[in-house]
């Protein structure tokens, strides 16, 4: 009987996920489901009245798993751009800790996991499915993440095909620097050989991306702050880590003669706060506008 509760939870989860019918999302706030079975992902949606040809903002939550909040915090931005918001929910039960933000590629002891459990291709499926349902797979879209969501995106761009007009990574706790002498999560060491080549780094640095930093994000402790020795090699605080990540990557691109399509935007007087970062006026510059 000790397996009864997880089993019941799983059944309820699948029922909940299958309750939304696929197709064009309704106007206003809503929820849809993408994928089937244990790959089903709940997506919180907002669509302004009369939405037709506008872009889609895919919002990636952090460790608090508050995708609904990210949807709500993005409504003003969506209205301004006559854009749709889609915020996928990567639940704690299936995507514990780094199984979400680091892609779930490796186990804790560094062994390769089954690709079916990786969070990166699941996100790609969400993006492609939503675009297709809304009638245009080539519609302009943006990937925006804060904290753990930014960790997710800065790693995602090296692993998955990216068709977004721009990726915006705000206040990530750590980054995967494009180097092999640091293990995965902080660098690309210990990954399968297919991800340990310069082609991956080139792809990563050529992807249009904004490293979006709150200048007051300088705390050295907190519930979800990585204070490990590996993390501190990147910098002592999130602001410093973001700056170092950008500068290291920029220098590598220059050294290799690659295109460097990143920008860095800093927001004064804002710390580790997704709502404030999303609704600051500088988000326009971060989006490339």
Locations of the language-model features?
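Active-site machinery of serine-nucleophile hydrolases
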Residues: 63-126, 246-249, 255, 262
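The conserved beta1-alpha1 loop
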Residues: 58-62
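Bacterial N-terminal signal peptides
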Residues: 4-16
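Short beta-to-alpha linker loops that shape the active-site pocket of alpha/beta-hydrolase fold enzymes
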Residues: 89-93, 173, 270
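Conserved acidic catalytic loop of the alpha/beta-hydrolase fold
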Residues: 122-139
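The feature captures the conserved acid-bearing segment of alpha/beta-hydrolase catalytic domains
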Residues: 166-254
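A domain-start/cap signature at the N-terminus of enzymes
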Residues: 16-56, 66-69, 80-83, 109-111, ...
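C-terminal catalytic histidine-bearing segment of alpha/beta-hydrolase fold enzymes
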Residues: 226, 243-289
């Amino acid at each position: 009987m000790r397996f009864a509760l997880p089993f019941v939870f799983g059944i309820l989860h699948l029922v909940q996920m299958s309750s939304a019918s696929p197709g064009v999302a309704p106007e206003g706030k809503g929820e849809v489901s993408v994928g089937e079975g244990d790959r089903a992902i709940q997506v919180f949606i907002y669509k302004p009245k009369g939405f037709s040809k506008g872009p889609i903002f895919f919002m990636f939550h952090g460790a608090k798993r508050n995708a609904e909040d990210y949807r709500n915090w993005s409504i003003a931005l969506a209205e301004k751009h006559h854009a749709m918001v889609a915020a996928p929910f990567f639940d704690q039960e299936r995507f514990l800790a780094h199984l979400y933000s680091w892609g779930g590629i490796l186990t804790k002891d560094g062994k390769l996991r089954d690709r079916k459990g990786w969070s990166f291709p699941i996100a790609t499926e969400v993006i492609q499915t939503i675009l297709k349902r809304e009638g245009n797979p080539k519609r302009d879209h943006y990937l925006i993440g804060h904290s753990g969501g930014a960790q997710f995106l800065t790693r995602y761009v090296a692993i998955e095909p990216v068709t977004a007009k721009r990726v915006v990574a705000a206040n990530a706790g750590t980054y995967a620097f494009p180097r092999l002498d640091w293990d995965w999560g902080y660098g690309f060491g210990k990954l399968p050989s297919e991800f340990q080549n310069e082609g991956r780094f080139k792809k990563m640095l050529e992807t249009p991306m904004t490293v979006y930093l709150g200048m007051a994000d300088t705390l050295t402790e907190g519930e979800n702050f990585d204070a490990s020795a590996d993390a501190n090699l990147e910098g002592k605080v999130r602001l410093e880590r973001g700056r170092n990540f950008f500068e290291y990557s920029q220098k590598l691109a220059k050294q290799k003669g690659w295109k460097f399509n990143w920008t860095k935007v800093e927001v004064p007087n804002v710390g580790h706060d997704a709502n404030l970062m999303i609704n600051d006026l500088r988000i326009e510059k971060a989006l490339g506008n």
